[in-house]
């Protein structure tokens, strides 16, 4: 049992019963802390906006100089930490590689989402930051993102495009060669990472991700979407789990028609997700300082007690 954000709305969380965060613990009894909103607004999660602010700061000269100073002096390092990288050279090599990738990324041709692309038939795929649990744990066996892109591209009709959008947090993680290999495929278009995913979703024929929120957003907006991993938002009729067998046996238009055959189920899903989630922010102080406010801690504590009573009804949980 682990608490985690439900992403939409971003100020609510649920308790998941599996390590893949695909199964939500369902509350049988109505509780006093279920002050649920009547409508769910699809918007970019708060944590993405916070991350983008931190990323912008991290690319300034002052921040890079401070990182270099901290690396040389190592005054922040706890040498009793068993997870600490012992090789100074290995750490330095990794950091130099990341900074080099960030600078070289500027030379990768990326397109704005303008009318020339908007009027095309396209599939949107958003990249994950890697390594990260969302793809290496939740998306196990589909963690090779380049292979996923190749497999999807092979299933596209000749006149369709595959739009690829980099995760802003991941800039510097992938080498320039990753992108140059992708761009050899004439069907692939690399979209500027600062473009709004919500705007791109609006005209997409299909949205695909390993386990990302973008598929959740698309399905809530009535756009067909698919995830390679099992997710709790596969309960939405317009968000299906995708496999290699699906790509092998059907082309993309056939997959879209299959997804559209399912009812949207958005109203039922909204009621279900709100009934089984709680107000509160599950995060860390760096990503979202609001998580350690007394008001939020009280909300999270109440939710934990509520779920505890649900699991062990006879227990005297105060």
What are these regions (language model features)?
Residues 5-9, 20, 128-132, 168-171, ...:
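Short, solvent-exposed loop/turn segments at secondary-structure junctions
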Residues 116-117, 182, 199-203:
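Structural alpha-helical scaffold elements that stabilize or flank donor/cofactor-binding regions
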Residues 116-151, 166-169, 271-274, 278:
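Active-site donor-nucleotide binding/catalytic segment of nucleotide-sugar enzymes
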Residues 193-240:
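A donor-sugar binding/catalytic signature common to diverse glycosyltransferases
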Residues 1-31:
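Active-site and donor-binding regions of nucleotide-sugar-utilizing enzymes
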Residues 23-67, 239-318:
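Leloir-type glycosyltransferase catalytic cores
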